[in-house]
Amino acid sequence: MRRFGVLSVILLAGCLYSLSGGGGLPRHIKTVAVIPFENETANPEVPGELHLELRKALESRLGVREAPETRASAVVTGTIKRYEADVPVGFSADPARATTARRRVQLVVDVKIVDQTTGRTLFERAAITAEGEYAERSEPAGRKQAIERIVSDIIEGAQSQW
């Protein structure tokens, strides 16, 4: 019975354990403004889709609320540097008809998160690259994969700073 009591105390203590660092943005960052990224590509859909996904992920994964730039604790800015679509990945098995079965998109962005209270750069990374594969004539599906991966890399990068 004594062993059960000791084991219970150890298990409960483990439930109360938490990390003081590495958990995201500094405590005073409660709101964030995501400025639409500059678009250096010919694709008009990427900026809007990336903006929407990043706003949702910051709230759900980092627990910050969206705010206008003038009232936000932090500001996210960036540039979409490259978007390449229609890169052939897989071909049909029929040698008589060499058609592409799968294609790939590649997305490259630069991003910066700045603490507006202190002026300090919280996270900055150039040339974050992600890819997405899609079936013939389904580019939006591949683009969605690439955007989700970019957003995930940004969130994980911001979390790892603390």
Regions found by a protein language model. Name each.
Residues 122-126:
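Short coil-to-beta-strand
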